[in-house]
Design a protein with these regions (language model features):
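Generic alpha-helical scaffold signal
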Residues: 3, 14, 31-38, 52
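Conserved GNAT-fold acetyl-CoA-binding loop/helix
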Residues: 21-42
């Protein structure tokens, strides 16, 4: 991600806000105001410069943004990162998530010097779990009552993969 393509991210997040909030905790309110988004983006780009996070956009063959994928390096273990990704509602089940995870894992282990990647999904998010398993992740543990979404507590299934 860069400042130049941050408006693509802003549009993508706004267009898919309701879809994402069905299964994920909502973003802060200021995230969807342009000035708030710009401020958050500046902070994220600083984190990226400091190698605290690696952010990538997922684009289709025509260059349209269809998703995003991030690696957030853990503060207490700089060789481990948490994987997160979002695919737009209109392009789910087309293979973008699987391919993006495959590509970012390669970068994580060969370019970024990471040794372990962890990823959490809501226990009901079977599609995301399939993407992780197809890319070599294994189930690690369950975190009960981890996320509060729509006034309900949701359990998280945690997966991990280590450098080959």
């Amino acid at each position: 991600m860069s400042e130049e393509n941050s408006l693509d991210v802003y549009s993508f997040e706004k267009e898919n806000r309701e879809y994402f909030e069905r299964n994920l905790p909502p973003r802060p309110a200021n995230y969807f105001g342009l000035e708030g988004f710009k401020e958050i983006t500046r902070e994220l780009l600083t984190e990226q410069t400091n190698r605290d996070v690696y952010m990538h956009l997922i684009r289709d063959s025509q260059g349209m943004m269809v998703g995003r994928i991030n690696l957030s390096v853990l503060e207490n273990d700089r060789t481990t990162a948490e994987l997160g990704y979002r695919i737009g509602e209109n392009v789910t089940n087309l293979g973008y998530a699987g391919e993006a995870v495959k590509l970012v894992l390669d970068k994580a282990f060969t370019t970024y010097g990471l040794n372990k990647i962890i990823a959490g999904t809501a226990t009901g998010n079977l599609a995301s779990q399939r993407v992780l398993i197809k890319n070599g992740f294994t189930f690690s543990r369950m975190i009960e009552n981890d996320l509060h979404i729509h006034n309900e507590w949701v359990h998280t299934a945690v997966f991990e993969i280590r450098r080959p």
